[in-house]
Amino acid sequence: GRSFQMVNLRHASSLVEIRERIQKAVVSRGPSQWIIGRGWNHYQWAEQREPTRKDLDDIIPNNPAMMVRACGHSIWVNTAALERAGVTSRTPNPAGGQIDKDPDSGEPTGLLREAQDIIEAHIPSPTLEDRKQMVLAAQEDALRSGITGVHTCESLKEWEAFAALEAEGKLKVRVYHLLPPDDL
């Protein structure tokens, strides 16, 4: 269900198209709310270049933004997100990760590779009500496709959303929910 709240960046043929999709999403968000997207792949773009924070800053000046690459191993963020996370030219690369920096100024470009945790730690966790809405959106999509049962392996917090919806009589699909070992 979380993916229904993200900006879909898949199959875009240009950075211009990506920016248009992001701009549409900004309209429905309040000031300072995070804008999160997933699926960009610069190899599919006409521009054939990696994006930078500047490509987001002019269209999202007031909201922190994080766009996850199609592979899931890199993120593209704007200046507001870097500021929220305290990432500067002096921030060292995390173990096993990299914060891309401009070779001339040393400032972060807005690309982080294998270093998503630096930014994600500053994104507020969804409330129980948020998680319930995510489940309901996913359930509606599944039912539209004729799917009446699902398997999921998510945290105890996600299970709480399923349990609450079941207690409210709103869960219409059968759910086989696995918990990660850390939640046992």
Regions found by a protein language model. Give the residues of each.
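Divalent metal-binding segments
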Residues: 1-184
